[in-house]
Amino acid sequence: MVEYQVKIDTFEGPLDLLLHLINRLEIDIYDIPVATITEQYLLYVHTMQELELDVASEYLVMAATLLSIKSRMLLPKQEEELFEDEMLEEEDPRDELIEKLIEYRKYKTAAKDLKEREEERQKSFTKPPSDLSEYAKEIKQTEQKLSVTVYDMIGAFQKVLQRKKITRPKETTITRQEIPIEDRMNEIVKSLKTAGRRINFTELFPSRQKDHLVVTFLAVLELMKNQQIIIEQEENFSDIYITGSESIHGA
């Protein structure tokens, strides 16, 4: 496959990914099941590497940290007791990570509040619509859907890969096709226009060839970044749907 890297602002670092997993899995941040969160984290990082996304070294450092915490949590009781005399009080191996996550969550919440206030100030200089009923209805419908992040998209892509591996027949000959990202983007836009409706994310992956799967996913990320598509998800872990934005339907 042609080497291609996608850099998107959504990738804010390993703490952001961990917080995403905690929220999506509805985990108590003060009592993190390390084995579960480590497994999910490593799966995401592996998928990001397969997609040739720009995975910073800090993601790998966090992976090592999680594995270290996991191993300490699995220490037999007898081994734990050997260290008790050297410690003033028993420490939870997760404490430092939990503290960092709580601080990061505060920072992220504050940043979100500042952004919302800035958007509100910008709206104050525009003329509001005379009839707000339709506008209010639209907002209400939008709020019923989750805010879909790139991490959600990676999770959905993981499911696609798993299904393709299960259904993929044995092949004696492998044909390698290099597909430009731009061409796949145009094909997706054309499909959305032809369908005239929102389509399921999985419908974009008819091929079983890994190169085609990866290029398709990268094309979706680019369309997201360019605001050419709208991503919707009704609830955690449910299907993701894609709709063309006004920019492509008006073209």
Curated annotation (Swiss-Prot):
GO biological process: cell division; chromosome segregation; DNA replication
Protein origin, superkingdom: Bacteria
Subcellular locations according to the entry: Cytoplasm
Predominant subcellular localization, coarse grouping: cytoplasm
Alphabetical keyword list: Cell cycle, Cell division, Chromosome partition, Cytoplasm
Keyword Cell division: yes
GO cellular component annotations of the record: cytoplasm
Listed transmembrane segments: none
UniProt KW Cytoplasm keyword: yes
Cited Gene3D superfamilies: 6.10.250.2410, Structural maintenance of chromosome 1. Chain E
Entry similarity comment: Belongs to the ScpA family.
Assembly description: Component of a cohesin-like complex composed of ScpA, ScpB and the Smc homodimer, in which ScpA and ScpB bind to the head domain of Smc. The presence of the three proteins is required for the association of the complex with DNA.
Cited HAMAP family: ScpA
Role played: Participates in chromosomal partition during cell division. May act via the formation of a condensin-like complex containing Smc and ScpB that pull DNA away from mid-cell into both cell halves.
Official protein name in the record: Segregation and condensation protein A
Organism name: Bacillus velezensis (strain DSM 23117 / BGSC 10A6 / LMG 26770 / FZB42) (Bacillus amyloliquefaciens subsp. plantarum)
